[in-house]
A protein has these predicted regions:
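Minor-groove-contacting beta-hairpin "wing" of winged helix-turn-helix DNA-binding domains
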Residues: 125-129
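Structured alpha/beta or helical-core interaction and ligand-binding surfaces enriched in interleaved
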Residues: 1-120, 130
Length: 130
């Protein structure tokens, strides 16, 4: 997967799934991802909304956006986009929660139009490179 494919992947996600945010209750989209660097360190994953169009660069996800720090496309090892995600937050002074749906079927169809390889199950759409 080259940088232009990654850029198209993230732009397609932004267009199909909507804007992301750091907090799930303010999101239209949600994902988990890890990098090769992090796999070598602690094997952890980050969670956040998908990057907004303004965060998506030619070679990386930019600093200070939805993901909070830069991520080079070449370092992304695995990204998971769930069909639905649970959110919880304080809205109008009260705890609220719910489930949001993500149309990974439409996303998969759009990614196929751009020849971007991915895997889709009944639970997630993912790209894994390890």
């Amino acid at each position: 997967m080259n940088s232009s494919d990654w850029k198209m992947f993230f732009l397609t996600c932004a267009d199909v799934l909507g804007p992301g945010d750091l907090l799930p209750f303010r999101n239209e989209s949600w994902c988990s991802w890890t990098t090769f660097s992090r796999l070598r360190s602690d094997a952890g994953y980050w969670q956040s909304g998908l990057p907004r169009r303004a965060d998506i660069g030619d070679e990386w996800i930019g600093d200070g956006g939805v993901w909070g720090q830069p991520f080079a496309y070449a370092d992304i090892a695995h990204i998971i986009i769930p069909r639905e995600f649970h959110w919880r937050g304080i809205l109008q002074g009260a705890l609220d929660e719910g489930i949001k749906q993500q149309d990974i079927d439409v996303l998969s169809s759009e990614l196929n139009k751009h020849a971007i390889a991915h895997r889709k199950t009944n639970l997630v759409l993912e790209m894994k490179f390890y």
